[in-house]
């Protein structure tokens, strides 16, 4: 087995590693269908071989060509390392600077088989969220990071390490762009071709920015979403006996089972992939499993009657589950579900993100490769059936929301009945969770802040949990607005229960929805704890791209922006640049993420705290911008909560000066001017 020293020594060429092919017993990505011409196939092969010297090209060319033919992409399976892939303690990485070792720690966590969805295809989550495009890129990146100094920056072009370039000590050590395609060519069809050629890739959000922390990363947001959905739709705080039905137990969607237990409801989650379902069950994220609809309904009724807390995984298609719930309603008059959503990977519906109810899992995988056009028709028919069932249940006291996975967008494209009469382009019959729930949370500056303890020691994580709890309790004691206090209280509950619910999968990480003040205060507290050796090693700060400022996405993060700018990406791009100039250790900008390729621009960062005063200064400056940018934009769009928060922030910081909007008080002024 390789060592970390060997892993950082560059591409293994003399001798070449044994070609072991695809590993049995681990999940693999669906076959891609890029429809390359003979000339384009030659180009894809030529592009792959340029990583290797001429003396090995003749040997590698046939196997790379076979991968392209069989799987629609050249992953270079021969170069999949035989080391145990996981986030090793930072001290074990060979490096010239500890920040580079921290980045290597994060990269290997994204590829840990316990974390990654399709580890051999370098996919972390979402069906196609790549860390790299091929294994040669992984080896080169690890080599560059091990050699990098504080006066160099590693530049990443869609998985490809362009090289180390001279820069200043204050510059980012790593700058990542993923999928930056000219807008006119940012279509799904073009993507399949460009990815097969090896010239671009879909990094999802935290997959391609090396900041994924396992399904915990979305558990907290799901907890907040379900809690606030119950408050808004059901008018309750206690979810005992309430039923939440949804789909997906993958890298992100797997969080739904754990979130259901944390909020105290009955979560029924459908999943077509048995491997994904069993993985969550083994990890303790899913309490029970069944492949019988009869048993599923029976168990749901029992738990509902006894007000049990339950996460039940149904191995089957969610459309069958929705239609069975309609059957129960029509035959017994009883609506067995209170809340519902969907977390299939609908951003990628025709290549494994959504499986049609008419086919088994294996039949669907075969058809999507052999006849993509027929497969697409079946997917769209299945979407129409799913929406029809949801619409019937919604006639009762049942509430559904879109989880920002492009479900309603794809349903609309399929011809399903999701239209909201008189609505704008970003509105449907059912709201997105941003429009009704998370949007106001973002507008107050709260979002999925996170940190990773690079020592790999659970005790370090426990210390950070204590520090974060103290920060939030002190903030409440100092006095905050009622709406902000509610968020803080939810977060204190989360942090106290996090360890009990065994949320860590992979690196020793924690997510916490926090606002600007909270993020800065937590960062300062952690940095001081590192300085006094209470925490043993550096801590990486980051966040999901799905945040206050990180993402422009008209069907998710910015779907509650109604001034017409929901389709504009200035905020996300400015955030990427602004983080880079204010002290981020690394920054990333992506096309796609969440809703899908061509639908989103998003970015993220990593910031390494090492206990120095300089690290504290960078954290204060960068985290303040990273939140205020989005609050200011949301304020300008007309959001009242954002207006109040940015005004308060300006009062607290005299160097912050934001342009504030003036409301049109009398709508008749517009009508008269336009002669309407």
From Swiss-Prot:
PROSITE patterns: UROCANASE. NAD(+) binds at residues 126-127, 204, 251-253, 271, 317-318, 343-347, 354-355, 403, 594. PANTHER family: UROCANATE HYDRATASE. The keyword Transport does not apply. Its EC number is 4.2.1.49. Transmembrane segments: none annotated. It is linked to Urocanase deficiency: An inborn error of histidine metabolism resulting in urocanic aciduria and neurological manifestations including intellectual disability, ataxia, episodic aggressive behavior or exaggerated affection-seeking. Keywords: Disease variant, Histidine metabolism, Lyase, NAD. NCBIfam families: PRK05414.1. GO terms for biological process: L-histidine catabolic process; L-histidine catabolic process to glutamate and formamide; L-histidine catabolic process to glutamate and formate. GO terms for cellular component: cytosol. Signal peptide: none annotated. Residues 15-35 are annotated as: Disordered. It catalyses: 4-imidazolone-5-propanoate = trans-urocanate + H2O. Gene3D superfamilies: Urocanase like domains, Urocanase superfamily. Belongs to the urocanase family. It is an enzyme of class 4 (lyase). This is Urocanate hydratase. Pathway: Amino-acid degradation; L-histidine degradation into L-glutamate; N-formimidoyl-L-glutamate from L-histidine: step 2/3. InterPro entries: Urocanase (IPR055351), Urocanase-like (IPR023637), Urocanase_C (IPR035401), Urocanase_central_sf (IPR038364), Urocanase_CS (IPR023636), Urocanase_N (IPR035400), Urocanase_Rossmann-like (IPR035085), Urocanase_sf (IPR036190).
């Amino acid at each position: 087995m390789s060592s970390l020293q060997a892993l950082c020594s560059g591409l293994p060429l003399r001798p070449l590693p044994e070609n072991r092919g695809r590993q049995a017993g681990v999940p693999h990505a669906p076959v891609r269908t890029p429809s390359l011409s003979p000339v384009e196939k030659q180009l894809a092969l030529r592009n792959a071989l340029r990583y290797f010297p001429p003396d090995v090209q003749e040997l590698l060319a046939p196997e790379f060509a076979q991968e392209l033919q069989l799987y629609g992409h050249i992953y270079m399976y021969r170069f999949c390392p035989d080391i145990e892939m996981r986030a090793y303690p930072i001290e074990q990485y060979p490096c010239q600077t500890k920040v580079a070792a921290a980045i290597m720690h994060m990269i290997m966590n994204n590829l840990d088989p316990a974390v990654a969805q399709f580890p051999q295809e370098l996919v972390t989550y979402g069906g196609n969220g790549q860390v790299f495009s091929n294994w040669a890129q992984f080896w080169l990146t690890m080599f560059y990071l091990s050699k990098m100094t504080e006066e160099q920056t590693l530049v990443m072009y869609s998985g490809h390490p362009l090289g180390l370039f001279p820069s200043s000590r204050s510059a980012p050590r790593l700058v990542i762009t993923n999928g930056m395609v000219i807008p006119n060519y940012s279509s799904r069809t073009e993507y399949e071709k460009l990815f097969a050629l090896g010239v671009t890739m879909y990094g999802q959000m935290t997959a391609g920015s090396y900041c994924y922390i396992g399904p915990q990363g979305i558990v907290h947001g799901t907890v907040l979403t379900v809690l606030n959905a119950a408050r808004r739709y059901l008018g309750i705080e206690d979810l005992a006996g309430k039923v939440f039905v949804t789909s997906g137990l993958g890298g992100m969607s797997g969080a739904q089972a754990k979130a259901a237990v944390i909020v105290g409801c009955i979560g029924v989650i459908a999943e077509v992939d048995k491997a994904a379902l069993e993985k969550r069950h083994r990890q303790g994220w899913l309490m029970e499993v069944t492949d019988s609809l009869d048993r599923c309904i029976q168990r749901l009724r029992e738990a509902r009657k006894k007000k049990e807390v339950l996460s039940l995984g149904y191995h089957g298609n969610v459309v069958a589950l929705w239609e069975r719930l309609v059957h129960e309603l029509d035959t017994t008059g009883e609506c067995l579900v209170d809340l519902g959503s969907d977390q299939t990977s609908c951003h990628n519906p025709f290549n494994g993100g959504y499986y049609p109810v008419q086919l088994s899992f294996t039949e669907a995988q075969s058809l999507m490769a052999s006849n993509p056009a027929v497969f697409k028709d079946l997917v769209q028919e299945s979407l129409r059936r799913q929406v029809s069932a949801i619409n019937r249940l919604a006639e009762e006291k049942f509430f559904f929301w879109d989880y920002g996975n492009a479900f309603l967008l794809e349903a609309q494209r399929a011809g399903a009945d999701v239209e909201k009469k008189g609505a704008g382009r970003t509105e449907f019959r059912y709201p997105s969770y941003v429009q009704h729930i998370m949007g106001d949370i973002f507008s107050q500056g709260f979002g999925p802040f996170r940190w990773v303890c690079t020592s790999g020691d659970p005790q370090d994580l426990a210390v950070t949990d204590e520090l974060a709890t103290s920060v939030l309790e002190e903030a409440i004691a100092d006095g905050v607005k009622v709406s902000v206090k509610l968020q803080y209280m939810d977060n204190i509950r989360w942090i106290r229960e996090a360890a009990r619910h065994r949320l860590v999968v992979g690196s020793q990480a924690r997510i916490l929805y926090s606002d600007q003040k909270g993020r800065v205060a937590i960062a300062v507290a952690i940095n001081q704890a590192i300085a006094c050796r209470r925490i043993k090693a550096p801590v990486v700060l980051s966040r999901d791209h799905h945040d206050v400022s990180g993402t422009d996405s008209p069907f998710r993060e910015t779907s509650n922006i109604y001034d017409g700018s929901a389709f504009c990406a200035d905020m996300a791009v400015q955030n990427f640049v602004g983080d880079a100039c204010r002290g981020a250790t690394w920054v990333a900008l992506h096309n796609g993420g969440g809703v899908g390729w061509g639908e989103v621009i998003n970015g993220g960062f990593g910031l390494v705290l090492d206990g120095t005063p300089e690290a504290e200064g960078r954290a204060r400056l960068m985290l303040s911008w990273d939140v205020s940018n989005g609050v200011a934009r949301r304020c300008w769009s007309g959001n009242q909560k954002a207006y109040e928060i940015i005004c308060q922030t300006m009062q607290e910081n005299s160097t912050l000066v934001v342009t504030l909007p003036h409301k049109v008080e009398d709508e008749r002024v517009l009508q008269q001017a336009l002669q309407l």
